[in-house]
Structure formats: structure tokens, C-alpha cells
Amino acid sequence: GLLEDIDFSAWKQVVDTNLNGVFLCTQHAFRVMKAQNPRGGRIINNGSISAHAPRPNSSAYTATKHAVTGLTKSASLDGRKYDIAVGQIDIGNAATDMTTAFTQGVAQADGSVKVEPVMDVSHVAQAVVYMANLPLSANVLNMTVMATHMPFVGRG
């Protein structure tokens, strides 16, 4: 919704889910990965294309996804000395319950409503598997996976 209309409790719920959840999982994974033998591991955070180009009326969601990007970069830096690789996958328009409405049309930055293509969610899973299978000497800090015809470049 519009920024001025967002109820603070709704804002906090989005922050708790999208940011605090990622923080708590990353924090716990760091503790486990530092203590295990051999030390290290890989963390892949769930970002969003909205961290790069927001949709209209998505302040809470967009803000949390920007924050996840910052957390991912910071954790990647902090994890280096412990052989912890931290990366993020930014997903655009994967076919899920959340994107069903995209086939009827989605609000655009210019005020229009346009149908947007979606991709099979299995492509996201394949990208995550690729990231996860890299040796710890290599890290994909950020990967964007989206439908080929998704209006991302030039969206905002």
C-alpha cells in the first residue's frame, strides 16, 4: 500500500519475516559453521529484484529486501576468515501463489497495469543448487534469476 497508509504493525510484520528472520538464521548458521570441523559453510539468502528496482506501493517489502542485501554483503565480509561464503539470490516473478495476479496485470511505475511474465520456480531451485555446489573457495555474492521477458531493466 501507500507509504502513508501502512499500519506500523503491518510494517513490523514484514520486517520480522523478511529481515529479522534472515538475520536470526544467518546468525545461527554462523555459530554452527564457525564451531564445526571442518570450519565453514555456505549461506544463501533470499533477496528480491525489488532490492534493485521497487514496485509501486511496496515500501515495506522493498526496504526489507534492500536490508537483506546489506546484511548479505556484511556477513560475506565477516565470514571470510571463517570460510563462510554468504550470497544472495534475487528472484523475479517466479510462478507462486504470490505472483498469480501478475497474469491479470500488475501496477507499473508509470501508473499503468500490465501483465508480467513468470518463470517456473524450479529454475530458481536450480540456481540455488548451483550456488550451493560451489567449493567454499568461490562465492556467488549476488545472482538475479527472472523471467526472460520480465520488465526489470528499465522498470525504475
Predicted features along the sequence, with ranges:
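A short helix-coil junction within the Rossmann-fold of NAD(P)-dependent oxidoreductases
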Residues: G1, H28-G40
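Alpha-helical segment proximal to the catalytic Tyr-Lys
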Residues: R31, L77-R80
